[in-house]
Every structure is written in structure tokens, then in C-alpha cells.
Amino acid sequence: VVHLNNIHTQLSPVLAELAHRRGIRVVWTLHDYKLLCPRYDCLLNGRTVCETCFNGDKKACLDNKCMKGSRLASFIGYREAVVWNRQQLEDATDILICPSRFMADKMAQGGFDARKMKVLCNFIDTGKCAKGDYGKGDYYCYIGRLSREKGIGTLIDAANRLPYKVKIIGNGPLANELK
């Protein structure tokens, strides 16, 4: 069995094809929406939810300059999506592991065979977590990557409407903007 994870940048989906041709089963754990959206995140200009490319035609990536606001980067993203098209990748992959039912549903909406989707949610062994009485505070906390696709802007908008503070812990492209 070949198990693929985050192969788009350093490696290539050709790994799935090579394994498949040799009769090796391929399991691919998805961590983003790259197989549906050249931008990875299904966000138009990093802000608005976009599912235009779900129909298989990735030309909207060019029209909207989805990749870094650049025509050249968008052309490269478009070409990559055309070369590694859905049918080709699906044929070479036996199982697609999705970390949520939402992702599995979106992959099926984008044309992937729902029978190949397996949902395996990310987990934590709560038995290994330290328990304690921390007392109730007047805030809630976000811990994670500070980037648009994580919804930090929405969190801050919501926090501004509530009588609670939000503490943000993490790093990423929005770190300086959030300070």
C-alpha cells in the first residue's frame, strides 16, 4: 500500500499513477481541497467561498487570478489542475481519506466517487489531557494557524459582537495584522 499525504508541492500525484500501474493499492489522505480547487482552499481571492472549479473546468482560476493574484501563478495552478485531472487521479487511487464528513461531501460534489471516500476524523486522546479547575474566565481562546482560510476574520467579527474577549494563539500569514 502507498499512503499519500500533501504531495502537491514537493512530490507529485504521479506517485499514485506509478503505484497503481504496478498493482499497488493507493490510499490518499486529504488535508485540503487541492483536487477540487487549484488554490487549495475554495476561497475566491482568499475571502469568499467559491466552488466554481468543482465542475471540473478550472479556467475560473485564470479569470480570477486565484493564485496569489498573479496571472502567471494562476496559469501554473490551472495547468497543474488540467494535467492532474480528477478522473486520472481517481482512477489511480483506491481510497480517499477525508478528515470530516463535510470534506467528503464536497469531494463528492466535485465529482469524486463517494464510494471511495472514507471519513477519519482527526482525534485526540482526551485521557492524556491534563484536567484541572481553571476557573471560568470572561474569554474564549483560538489556538491554530493564523490564516484567512481558518476563518479568523469571522471569529474576530463575532467576538466584537459578544461581551467576551477572544485570545488568539498561533502563527501564520495574518500574525502581524492581528497584533
Where are these regions (language model features)?
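Conserved donor-binding/catalytic core segment of Leloir-type glycosyltransferases
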Residues: I97, G132-P163, K167
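A short, basic/aromatic alpha-helical/loop segment that forms part
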Residues: Q10, T126-K128, R145-I152, P173-A175
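Short, structured helix-loop element that forms part of the nucleotide-activated donor/catalytic region
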Residues: K106-Q109, Y164-K179
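An amphipathic, basic-hydrophobic alpha-helix
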Residues: V1, Q10-V14, E80-N85
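Short N-terminal targeting/anchoring amphipathic segment
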Residues: V1-L11, I24-T29
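Membrane-proximal helix-turn-helix segments that form the acceptor-binding/catalytic region
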Residues: R21-R22, K34, G46-I95, D105
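A short beta-strand/loop micro-motif in the catalytic core of glycosyltransferases
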Residues: V27, D91-S100, K167
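Carbohydrate-associated surface elements
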Residues: F102, F123
